[in-house]
């Protein structure tokens, strides 16, 4: 007997059973991070209202904030037009989404002309990662 929710049938997972997931601040619209979700992670996220991802490096579910305390409360889940990307509109607890201690994982901007361009860090560290992951 299949206990998977019917809405899951519209979600297109890749050959590894994963789908990219974009976490966006529900209030400001700032993109916080991109991660991956498995069916189990997406189902748990929808059921609990807390963001759960699939850690490709650890090969297990990653409940955002389980180590750092910086959980994501999900306000809304959206599916893109092709069904192959999830958007999570979240409240980021602690204001830190990135393991580097920044609000967003997108803290570097490309500056300069094509051949002279370089990535410049534009967002500050809000909390030392060594204090987050101790």
From Swiss-Prot:
Which superkingdom, per the lineage? Bacteria
Q: Pathway it belongs to? A: Amino-acid biosynthesis; L-histidine biosynthesis; L-histidine from 5-phospho-alpha-D-ribose 1-diphosphate: step 3/9
Per UniProt, the keywords (alphabetical) are: Amino-acid biosynthesis, Cytoplasm, Histidine biosynthesis, Hydrolase, Magnesium, Metal-binding, Zinc
Q: Where in the cell is it found?
A: Cytoplasm
What EC number(s) does the entry state? 3.5.4.19
What is its quaternary makeup? Answer: Homodimer.
Q: Which family does it belong to?
A: Belongs to the PRA-CH family.
Supply the PANTHER family for this chain.
HISTIDINE BIOSYNTHESIS BIFUNCTIONAL PROTEIN, HISTIDINE BIOSYNTHESIS BIFUNCTIONAL PROTEIN HIS7
HAMAP family, alphabetized: HisI
What name has this protein been given in UniProt?
Answer: Phosphoribosyl-AMP cyclohydrolase
Origin organism of this chain? Bordetella pertussis (strain Tohama I / ATCC BAA-589 / NCTC 13251)
Q: Source gene?
A: hisI
């Amino acid at each position: 007997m299949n206990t998977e929710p019917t809405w899951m049938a519209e979600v297109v997972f890749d050959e590894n059973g994963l789908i990219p997931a974009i976490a966006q601040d529900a209030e400001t619209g700032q993109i916080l991070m991109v991660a991956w979700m498995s069916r189990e992670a997406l189902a748990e996220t929808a059921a609990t209202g807390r963001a759960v991802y699939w850690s490709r490096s650890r090969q297990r579910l990653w409940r955002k904030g389980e180590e750092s305390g910086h959980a994501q409360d999900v306000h809304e889940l959206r599916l893109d037009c092709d069904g192959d990307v999830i958007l999570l509109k979240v409240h980021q607890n602690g204001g830190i989404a990135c393991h580097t201690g920044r609000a967003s994982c997108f803290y570097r901007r490309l500056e300069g002309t094509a051949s002279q361009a370089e990535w410049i860090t534009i967002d500050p560290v809000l909390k030392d990662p060594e204090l987050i992951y101790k």
